[in-house]
């Protein structure tokens, strides 16, 4: 199998694992060398920057087994099959923080492009309202909702109290935006 991508020739790909994620090994030319790289295929995801009318951001704190720590994060989650990014953002906002609101697309980025296919779509959620029917959290989630001033959230990013990269990117982006939210 030869596939030409961005002036790179992919010689082959083989699946190493398949479950909630897939791990594959791609073999390709890099200049005159043949390189093999393991790639995680992960569904795309959404991140929500939920701001209330008092200048607070709604964050979540949850234990993350991979880090063996509780992290402070923006509400986020994977896009399920058949969902648009906006549908997923509405669902995740309801599940994780119990709110609905107006969603505005902000930006997209790859989270770990050196080895992972996941792209995250970020949304601003404004005009927040308590959800009439709150969805159940995922079975691996135990979430505490935190509402703090956006300026305090930025300070927590700078001081190292917030260490989740998607959250740092989102808070930095919204804090440095010239648009009045």
Predicted regions, residues:
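A short, amphipathic edge element
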Residues: 2-14
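Unchanged
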Residues: 46-47, 79-165
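Long hydrophobic alpha-helical segments typical of transmembrane helices together
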Residues: 161-181
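Conserved Nudix-box catalytic region and its N-terminal flanking loop in Nudix hydrolases
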Residues: 2, 40-42, 47-91, 139
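Acidic, metal-coordinating catalytic segment for phosphate/diphosphate chemistry
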Residues: 11-47, 53
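Short loop segments at secondary-structure junctions
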Residues: 31, 52-54, 63, 126-130, ...
């Amino acid at each position: 199998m030869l596939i030409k991508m961005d002036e790179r020739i992919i010689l082959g790909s083989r699946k190493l694992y398949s479950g909630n994620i897939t791990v594959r090994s791609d073999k390709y030319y890099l200049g005159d060398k043949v390189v093999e790289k393991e790639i995680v295929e992960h569904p795309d995801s959404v991140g929500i920057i939920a701001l209330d009318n008092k200048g607070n951001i709604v964050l979540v704190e949850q234990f993350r087994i991979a880090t063996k720590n509780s992290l402070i994060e923006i509400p986020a989650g994977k896009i399920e099959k058949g969902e648009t990014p906006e549908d997923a953002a509405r669902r995740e906002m309801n599940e994780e923080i119990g709110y609905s609101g107006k969603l505005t697309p902000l930006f997209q980025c790859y989270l770990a492009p050196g080895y992972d296919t996941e792209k995250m779509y970020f949304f601003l959620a404004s005009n927040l309202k308590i959800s009439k029917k709150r969805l159940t959290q995922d079975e691996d989630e135990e979430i505490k909702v935190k509402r703090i001033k956006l300026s305090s959230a930025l300070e927590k990013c700078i001081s190292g109290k917030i260490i989740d990269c998607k959250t740092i990117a989102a808070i930095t982006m919204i804090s440095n935006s010239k648009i009045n939210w």
